[in-house]
Amino acid sequence: MARMSLMIMMIMVAVTMINIAKSDPIAPCYFIFGDSLVDNGNNNQLQSLARANYFPYGIDFAAGPTGRFSNGLTTVDVIAQLLGFEDYITPYASARGQDILRGVNYASAAAGIRDETGRQLGGRIAFAGQVANHVNTVSQVVNILGDQNEASNYLSKCIYSIGLGSNDYLNNYFMPTFYSTGNQFSPESYADDLVARYTEQLRVLYTNGARKFALIGVGAIGCSPNELAQNSRDGRTCDERINSANRIFNSKLISIVDAFNQNTPDAKFTYINAYGIFQDIITNPARYGFRVTNAGCCGVGRNNGQITCLPGQAPCLNRNEYVFWDAFHPGEAANIVIGRRSFKREAASDAHPYDIQQLASL
């Protein structure tokens, strides 16, 4: 029954996407800032351990391995199709010409809000670097449209999705071997530092024409197979120390949304509760057709989480029954649920104050 319910849900999402794609998108463009949860190829040419351009990544994606840290779609792929785009948003590394008018994906695996986050993994493009790349894109949009006012009007209708912070915990604060932030900051003061840096970049985006912002909260990192493998005695109980810190950060994101909405009346900000949506999935897995919530479909060691999915490794066959694809990242089936609920909330707590569909219509 659970497998049947998941199949029905995926068919319904696919039909909805096809119907939407027949008309113009409800937003002219979609700009994406983030990390490996939404990277779709920007790290492929970097000297980095944080790359996913090899099999079995992309095993269920039509184009095969592209750099997505998933067996198939990411959440922003789902959202892009629900917005009405006929194709996925192009990564900055390969975006050229008129294609940028549809939007650009700047996300980079291992990236964080802090510049040093993820440095032990090699090359990555931190939030400030992603925003700098967008400023370059804006100048190209002005050239294409031929007028600054025309470009500003066009960009004001676009959706700007920002989902960073996970690596600032996973590959910084809770990694004392490489970073001192865990000793320098309390969870509260660290979240304050992240939010101050985050806010600075939002202001740069605003200055460069962004007016519709969707801030994606950090998920329950303490429930990932990697953290369960390292820190959970029974391999099932999430690491509350990490999840508690994530919730502190998320609560401050909500405060950012409220402050910007009050102080910048010509812009609209919303918070997407990825943490809450994900918690619902792992608390009620059968509702979504999942059977395994604590292990990766592809990985090595305890919970398939001690080493992430290796090149050429054979993944599980029942991928739609696993919440996680690898040691850190949800699989396509979970991404469809998260993307769908981000676009159109199913519970009041999924988004504050708007879901992405509502944001696009404002």
From Swiss-Prot:
<keyword id="KW-0732">Signal</keyword>
<dbReference type="GO" id="GO:0016788">
    <property type="term" value="F:hydrolase activity, acting on ester bonds"/>
</dbReference>
<dbReference type="GO" id="GO:0005576">
    <property type="term" value="C:extracellular region"/>
</dbReference>
<feature type="signal peptide">
    <location>
        <begin position="1"/>
        <end position="23"/>
    </location>
</feature>
<keyword id="KW-0442">Lipid degradation</keyword>
<dbReference type="InterPro" id="IPR001087">
    <property type="entry name" value="GDSL"/>
</dbReference>
<keyword id="KW-0964">Secreted</keyword>
<dbReference type="GO" id="GO:0016042">
    <property type="term" value="P:lipid catabolic process"/>
</dbReference>
<dbReference type="Pfam" id="PF00657">
    <property type="entry name" value="Lipase_GDSL"/>
</dbReference>
<feature type="active site">
    <location>
        <position position="329"/>
    </location>
</feature>
<keyword id="KW-0443">Lipid metabolism</keyword>
<keyword id="KW-0378">Hydrolase</keyword>
<dbReference type="InterPro" id="IPR035669">
    <property type="entry name" value="SGNH_plant_lipase-like"/>
</dbReference>
<protein>
    <recommendedName>
        <fullName>GDSL esterase/lipase At5g45670</fullName>
        <ecNumber>3.1.1.-</ecNumber>
    </recommendedName>
</protein>
<feature type="active site">
    <location>
        <position position="326"/>
    </location>
</feature>
<feature type="active site" description="Nucleophile">
    <location>
        <position position="36"/>
    </location>
</feature>
<dbReference type="InterPro" id="IPR051238">
    <property type="entry name" value="GDSL_esterase/lipase"/>
</dbReference>
<dbReference type="InterPro" id="IPR036514">
    <property type="entry name" value="SGNH_hydro_sf"/>
</dbReference>
<comment type="similarity">
    <text>Belongs to the 'GDSL' lipolytic enzyme family.</text>
</comment>
